[in-house]
Amino acid sequence: QDIAGNQVSAGQTVTVDSSVTLTIDTIAVDDIISDAESQSDVTISGTASTADAGRTVTVTLGGNTYNATVQPDGTWSVDVPAADVQAQSDGELTVTASLTDAAGNAVSVDHLVTLDTTAPVVTINPIATDDIVSAAEAGGLVTLSGTAEANSTVVITIGTLTFNATTNASGVWTTDVSLAALADGDYTANVVATDAAGNSGTTNRPFEM
């Protein structure tokens, strides 16, 4: 209002930017890095706001720091060198991503990933108790059994025959199979166990028909 009593008003819209968008995608497909996957660089990626295109996302893993740039579509990614991954101990690792936007707002998000580079130890018990399958035993079902890491898939190969089993929560596997197709002679049961991370362990057991 001026001295003559005239009044005027003005307005302006102010946008308050107090939030930052930042996510981390699933790592190595299933958030489990196997031994085979650790032999190559591991990609860590995610998304941010398209408004933050060109800004830097700082990623930390196991004490190492890496930088990624937000792309025009809001995505970002960085490759962690295989040597850095292999330097970590098996177990749960925390990946942290941090970003500060143009308004000065900062955000940091964590993502858990499991490093499992240890091949499962697999065993197979004596076949037909004494590793000799008699004619009478061959006429029925023969139990193949053993142990491996819990929840592993097990493939048993004997000559041209292939059988499948799965370990239970205690790591025990068992399957009843027919060996009637095998002629008399010496054979080897080859066993491959693959754990949830994709690591494989092998063993074998000779037996006689």
Predicted regions and their residues:
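Aromatic/hydrophobic beta-strand junction motif of beta-rich domains
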Residues: I44-A48, V142-A148
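Short, acidic Ser/Thr/Gly-rich low-complexity loop/linker segments typical of extracellular
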Residues: Y66-P72, F163-A169
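Surface-exposed, short loops/turns at beta-strand junctions within beta-sandwich domains
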Residues: A82-E92, S178-D186
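Short strand-edge motifs at loop-to-beta-strand transitions and within beta-strands
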Residues: G74-V78, G171-V177
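Hydrophobic/tyrosine-rich beta-strand signature of extracellular beta-sandwich/beta-rich modules
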Residues: L93-A97, V191
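Short, solvent-exposed loop/edge segments of extracellular or virion-exposed proteins
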Residues: D17-E37, P120-E137
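Flexible, low-complexity linkers/stalks enriched in Thr/Pro that connect modular domains
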Residues: D2-D25, N105-N125, T203-M209
